[in-house]
Amino acid sequence: MHGLFVNKKKNDTGSTALVLKKIQSGDTKLKEEFIKDNVPYIIRTISNILGIVVDDRNSEEFSIGLAAFNEAIDRYDADKNGNFYTYSFVVIKSRLYDFIRRNRKHNNVLPFSYIEESTRVDERLLMSDASGQFEKIEVRQELVSFEKSLKEFGISLEDLVLSSPKHKDSRLLLIKIARIIADDDNMFRKLVEKKYIPMKEVLSRIKVNHKTIQRNRKFIIAVSLILRSNLYDLKEYVQGFEREGKYHG
C-alpha cells in the first residue's frame, strides 16, 4: 500500500477522513503506512516552517515533526477540523515553535515564522472540543487588524511563513525596501490604496533588480504594514534586524 496516501488533493478530505477513522479505531498497521507515506510531506512542512533544509530523518526537527504528525492523526476530528493536512500543518507548526523557544539554535528563524499569538490562536481553534469555542477565543485586536490588512492584498500568515527569505542578507535588503515604502507617505498611500508596490518610486530610491521585489512582494508588503502599525512586538523584531544590519554594515 506504499504510496497510497501521497499527493492527496485538498478536496480529497473525505477519503482521508475515512482512512483516519480506521486508524483511530485501532488499525495500527494502516497508521504506520499512512505515516510512512507522508514522510515527504512532514519533511517539506518542517523545511517551510523553519526556513531550513531538513533532509536528515534522524534530526531533532524531524523527530518533533513526526511526533506532531502522529499527534494530529490521534486528535483529528473530521467534523470540526476540516482538511487533515491543514490541521496537521498547524499542529506541526505549534510543536516546532515550542522547540524554537527552547533552542537558541533557531534564533534566526524569520519573524513571520514566529508569530506566537497567531500560533496559539490557530491551535486553540483547531483543537477545540466544540465549535462554540471558536467564538470564545480572544485574539489581540492589533493582530486581527494586521491579518485583515494582509487579506486585502491576498496574503495570509501562512503565506508569510512560506515566502519569508531564508538568508540574512536577503532579509535585510527586503526590510530596507519595506522601510523606504513605509517612511514615504506618498508611496505607502499608493501601496494601501492600489494594493501594489510602487515599483518606479522604489527603484528610484534603491538599486535593486525589479524581479527581486516581485518575487518577494508578500514579505515587503507585510513588513511595510508592520512598520506603519501598532504591532509593537513584530515592529521591534523588524527594527532589531535593521539595527543588526547597521552594526555589521
Curated annotation (Swiss-Prot):
Induction: Autoregulated. Up-regulated in the presence of xylan. Up-regulated in pretreated yellow poplar (PYP)-grown cells. One of its GO terms (molecular function) is DNA binding. Keywords: Cytoplasm, DNA-binding, Sigma factor, Transcription, Transcription regulation. Pfam families: Sigma70_r2. It is found in: Cytoplasm. GO terms for cellular component: cytoplasm. Interacts with RsgI3. Sigma factors are initiation factors that promote the attachment of RNA polymerase to specific initiation sites and are then released. This sigma factor is involved in regulation of cellulosomal genes via an external polysaccharide-sensing mechanism. Recognizes the predicted promoters associated with sigI3 itself, pl11, ce12 and cipA. This is RNA polymerase sigma factor SigI3. It comes from Acetivibrio thermocellus (strain ATCC 27405 / DSM 1237 / JCM 9322 / NBRC 103400 / NCIMB 10682 / NRRL B-4536 / VPI 7372). The lineage of its organism: Bacteria, Bacillati, Bacillota, Clostridia, Eubacteriales.
